[in-house]
Structure formats: C-alpha cells, structure tokens
Design a protein with these regions (language model features):
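Non-catalytic beta/alpha edge segments that cap or flank active sites
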Residues: 1-165
Length: 165
C-alpha cells in the first residue's frame, strides 16, 4: 500500500471562494487497494507555504507519493513547479515529460503546462494541472505507469531490465 499526500494549490480555494474539485478527483481516481490518502490540504499559491507543505509530507509524514494540483500555468501566481524544485533532491523529469506528451495528444494547450516531477527522500512528487478534466486525464495515464518507479524508490524492486538467464 502506497501512502499519498494530495495538495490543491489555489488562492481562491484556500480562501473558501472556490470549491476544490481537483483534489477530491485525484483521491477518487486512486485505486483504493493500492493507495492510502493520508493527507489532503488546500493551500494558496505561496512559494514558501507550498515548499513547507511538501517538506512536511516527505520528511515528517513520509508519504510515498505526493500529488499536487494547480499552480502550473503561466499566471504570475502559478509557482508550484518552482516551489517543488526548491525542495527537490533529485529530478525525475521523464514523468512530467510523459504526462505532457500524453496530454498533447488530447489538446495542444498541454504545451503550456509547467508541472515538474521530482524525488525528495523516498517520496515521488508529481505536479498535476489544476482543471478537473486535465487531472482526470493525467491520473488515467499516471496510475498505470508509476508503480514500478515507486517500488524501486521504496526498495521493493531493484531491477529495471530483464534478468539474464
């Protein structure tokens, strides 16, 4: 069972001016037999606050996976990728690149996404878009593809290639 933290990053959501639908959608789409959501929080687009919450989930709660939603666009307040990179120990760019490539097959506007994917300690962090539709599409793609990486990160598996006979 993988432990998961979900962070919705939205000024309006944090202020109670907008209902968060993307964070709950992430939780809904996580297979219940494999993923246990241990934290869900809505925070504003504040770089330090985002970084602090990521550190808490990685270092204190020790989540295996942290999924963020929101703050990945071009708005001056969209700083989720920067806050994520601030606390990263290792980059895992293939995940964000693959998500963008998949999303590009659905809409050319996906090229405007700036989400990052990184590792801190034994936690994989993936920035997802903010819209419910984009979150749903991203989760469909992501869930079938990251478990092997999580297993390696957590020490459950050490082989990426086939074994010699």
């Amino acid at each position: 069972m993988y432990t998961v933290g979900i962070i919705t990053i939205s000024d309006k959501g944090a202020a109670g001016q907008r209902e968060d639908k993307s964070g709950p959608k992430i939780k809904e789409l996580l297979p219940k037999d494999k993923y246990d959501v241990v934290s869900y929080k809505i925070i504003p687009d504040e770089r330090k606050q985002i970084a602090d919450e990521l550190v808490r989930l990685c270092d204190d709660v020790k989540c295996n996976l942290v999924l963020t939603t929101g703050g990945t666009g071009f708005s001056p307040r969209d700083i989720t990728p920067e806050a994520t990179m601030d606390i990263a120990e290792r980059n895992a760019p293939g995940i964000a690149e693959a998500l963008r490539a998949y999303s590009m097959s659905l809409t050319p506007k996906a090229m405007l996404g700036r989400g990052a994917s990184v590792i801190r300690k034994n936690t994989l962090i993936v920035n997802l878009p903010g819209s419910v539709k984009a979150v749903s599409e991203s989760m469909d793609f992501l869930m079938g593809n990251i478990e092997h990486g999580l297993d390696i990160l957590l020490g459950y598996d050490s082989e990426c290639g086939g074994k010699l006979k």
